[in-house]
Amino acid sequence: MLREELNEKDTWDLTTIFANNEEFEKAFNNANIEIENIKKYENIMINSSDELYQTTKTIYEVGEKIDRIYTYANLKYSEDTSNNDSQTLMGRAQELYKKFSEATVFYDTKLISLDEETFEKYISENKNLREYEIVLRNAYKYKPHTLSDAEEKLLAAFQKERGTASDIYETFTASDLTFGKIKDENGKEVELTDTNYSLYMKSQNPEVRKSAFKTLYKTYEQYQNTFASIYAGQIEVEKTCAKVRGYKSAMEAALFADDVTPEVYDNIVNSISNHLDVLFKYYRMKKRVLGLNDMHIYDVYVPLISNFERNYTYDEAVNEVLEATHIFGDEYVNILKQGYKDRWVDVYPNKGKRGGAFSGGCATTNPFILLNFQGTEYDVSTLAHESGHSMHSYFTRKNNPLQYADYRIFVAEVPSTVNELVLAYYRLEHTENKLEKLSILNSLLELYKATIYRQIMFAEFEKTTHELSEKGEVLTAELLNKEYYEINEKYFGGEIILDKEISYEWMRIPHFYYNFYVYKYAIGLTGASKIVKRIRAKEPHALEDYFEFLKIGNKKNPIESLKVAGVDFTNTNVFDSAIQIFDELIDEFEKLYKEL
């Protein structure tokens, strides 16, 4: 379907950002002028607390105008990436953003050049400046890790090269690897790719699963030394950069921005290690349901039950999400309902439209949602998920000034996952169809297994490999394969036959090049589980705590923000609620399955 063939009510209303092209061009031209005016602050910024306030205030105000322009261009481009006008618009917005970044590059350097006594004096003496205290402290905290101007320029010159290992990995895996052919369920010879591999791992035919598994990893085995060199190079660069900047480790450097300590990271990994018995219970149940005497590692992705698929109209999806979120009260539902009515959502696929789904916007726009809705249960869950992001953005922006009207990636997946969970519970409670219930339970079980256990397994491997490197160990393919196999032994606990090829799986995980990122996936589901458990149990202040969390923005760091919602990642029992839910879901699935 072409963009112009869509019904207007099913598209997002971007006229709420700019009513027409003239408005956009006026804003664009004014922004260019204001960017030039920022440059005058460079030499006076730290002369007094008032100059620091004026500089900071101006940068945030101009930055928001740039964000508004960029948001408009990005959303126009996303709705039809093949449209020449939208391509041009996007290019112009990107150049404007680059110009703004270059014009403000002096800010952090100047701020950090203040001695601590003067920095504290400026904040204490200036009431207006104290409105920006948290963002100022977030920038100033890098002072001990900032080098001289000459050294910083030298490091900046190598910034592109810092991503070389990741670039090589991406190019090599996307363009150069081939995996040969396998026979599918119908005996037809098909080309195996890294993309369709996951489909064959869910095949009901064990020979197809085995063939896909063995064939894929045969290729990775051939290039194991190359992958080891790439990954070791990535770790070496991050280790060196951390050392140069005065961090104790690459882990400490990577976690520093979110105010997360290595101790908190270790607590997260260790907490899951204390709950592996529930994961083993899941695999034992899966083995029984699938009727397998022996369960190989290539059997773990087979669905417990073929998905029960309902078809939804978009209106039905909206109604189901609104009904499910009634658990949060009328205020939440009424705002979301009005958002749908006010065309926050771009609903259907069209030619040239960006794939997938996202929630996007900035502090002065609506929290728009892009979907590619085709009526599946997954699409309804996606609507709930993205609506969770958008409602988080709505409450954050409505309750904070510009400088705090956003939130960090660390907490971003919590409200979206909360919505996914309440939708799943709503569905379970409002259907009598046992197959549908089993399908929902199967999806939830896979969600917990993949998002908590698997991601933390990756996080543990990443921690181990960095520690080995920092001890002076050479990260050979043999060593990496051994460490990865042993971590798999720990997480599969003798319940699964670990074919030797699983040793090579670390080679196909791109997240290891994101530098201590994977643990954040577990944060979202763990936090959401605790919040939903509290709300469903009608714990005192559970709803109030959740709304306070939604409204807090960047006024607190991520760990402290989640504490407001009743989730404490410094506590060793932080995963208890999520694991308890996982445990209960296993029991519920098996009990219901026996009733078929």
Residues of each region from the PLM?
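Post-HEXXH active-site segment of zinc metalloproteases
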Residues: 381-382, 393-417
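Long, K/E/R/D-enriched contiguous segments that form extended
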Residues: 285, 289-327, 333-334, 392, ...
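C-terminal, non-catalytic "cap/extension" segments appended to globular domains
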Residues: 4-6, 107-114, 126, 134-141, ...
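Catalytic zinc-binding patch centered on the HExxH motif and its immediate surroundings
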Residues: 310-312, 345-365
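A well-structured
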Residues: 1-307, 592-595
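Active-site metal-coordination segments of metallo-dependent hydrolases
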Residues: 403-415, 447, 477, 514-521
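Short pre-active-site segment immediately N-terminal to the catalytic Zn-binding motif
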Residues: 309-314, 364-384
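Conserved helix-loop functional segments at active or binding sites
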Residues: 323, 327-334, 357-360, 389, ...
